[in-house]
Amino acid sequence: MSADVAVLALHYQNDVLHADGKIRVGLDADSGARQRLLDNAAALLEGARSHALPIVHVRIAFRPDYADLLPNCDIFRNVARIGAVPEGQWGSAFYDGLQPLADSTREFVVKHTRISAFYGTPLEETLRLLGARRLVVAGVATHSVVEGTVRHAADIGFSVMVAEDACASADPAVHAASLASMRLIAQTAPVADAVRWAAAPN
């Protein structure tokens, strides 16, 4: 096992992934793409656990009255408009099967309220305490929280691998464009290759 790697699992939550969720990023209940994403996300978490890699599960949530939401752009205004990811309710909870292991000392949860999972959170401190220098990042949506977090991670000195098939956007073309853009600052690979990269001695 390489001790300098952590996995970031971003927004694997009911409102984002469940067929009855309020966001869903285009992942309809009968969508083959949706099932592939769920399977790949599960494989990423399983792979990380099999190599005893730390996992930081990042969730987005707001007060039910959205008083803590800064509505400075459409992506946030839309969250409040549709009533998504309210704290303490089903929508903001982790999707069943992709949740943290309750009894694990290698899994952590960080809550955020902006685009980057680092902004205004203890994520960087957590990763430094773990000794992480390399990150495997995956989540939904590719072009928002994933790309925002990857760019922030690169700026503060982490080497990043994006597990591309454990990510998704509502529009596959937007997903592909985001991955292409991130390749300037990160590597991208399918889950199986990303896990091998993480587990390899550095």
Predicted regions and their residues:
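A short, N-terminal amphipathic alpha-helix
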Residues: 35-54
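A short acidic, glycine-rich active-site loop
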Residues: 26-39, 79-89
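Active-site-adjacent betaalpha module
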Residues: 1-6, 47-51, 74-202
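Short, electropositive alpha-helical surface patch
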Residues: 61-80
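Short beta-strand segments at enzyme active-site cores
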Residues: 53-60, 163
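Short acidic, Gly/Ser-rich segments with clustered Asp/Glu that frequently serve as metal-coordination loops
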Residues: 13-19
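N-terminal nucleotide-binding beta1-loop-alpha1 segment
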Residues: 6-12
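Active-site loop signature of alpha/beta-hydrolase-fold enzymes
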Residues: 15, 63, 169
